[in-house]
Amino acid sequence: PYPERYFSAVESGRRLLSAVPLAATSAGLSLMGAEDLRAGRAVSPDFTGAGWRDYLGYTDMPVLSLPEAGRAIATIAAGYDFSFFEHWPTDQAGHRGTLTEAVVHLEAIDTVLGGLLEVWDERHGLFIMTSDHGNLEEKSHSRHTRNPVPTLLFGRDHARHADAIHDLTDIAGVVRECLGLGVPADS
């Protein structure tokens, strides 16, 4: 979800849509906002929602525990054919943080995944977690790396799909297959 000031900045031309919002709006989808977060239809990129209270001034925003956030992600995803959760705090930690901060972020992700797995049902489909680049693992500089990034899969046919993924460019094909879309004609 995005705060109102994000939408205002885009509308005024002070900022451009970043990659995920651009893809969603280009597909005719509406971006989620504060009301979606309050209503439990979205999970904050920081997982808990504390950032909305502490940094964005949304004092009425509910705050989740990390396991609750994982369960919420699973519950929300179960209502859609395709669900995309963008978690960018690890990118910030990679650019500006210390190794200790990186470990804290990875432990948080582990706890969220534990909550998600408590309620995930294979009938929900396939869960894929990956990244578009590395940078959290390399603390000698603050740039993105070209290191291979891990991909985690669980759910329906996860082993078969894992065998089809060799790098980031293979993710789209797996998603298309799961959605029954086949291979694009121009591939």
Residue ranges and their predicted role:
Residues 1-81, 86-93:
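His/Asp/Glu-rich, glycine-adjacent segments
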Residues 69, 73-76, 105, 109-112, ...:
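Alpha-helical packing segments of well-folded alpha/beta enzyme cores
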Residues 87, 129-133, 153-155:
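Active-site proximal loops enriched in glycine and acidic residues that flank catalytic Cys/His/Asp
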Residues 93-94, 136-140, 160-161:
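Short active-site-adjacent structural elements
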Residues 93-111:
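Active-site-proximal segments of metal-dependent phosphoesterases and phosphodiesterases across multiple
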Residues 106-144, 175:
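Metal-dependent active-site segment of extracytoplasmic phospho-/sulfohydrolases and closely related
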Residues 143-178:
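Substrate-binding rim/cap in mid-to-C-terminal beta-strand-loop elements of soluble/periplasmic
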Residues 181-187:
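Polar, surface-exposed loop/tail segments
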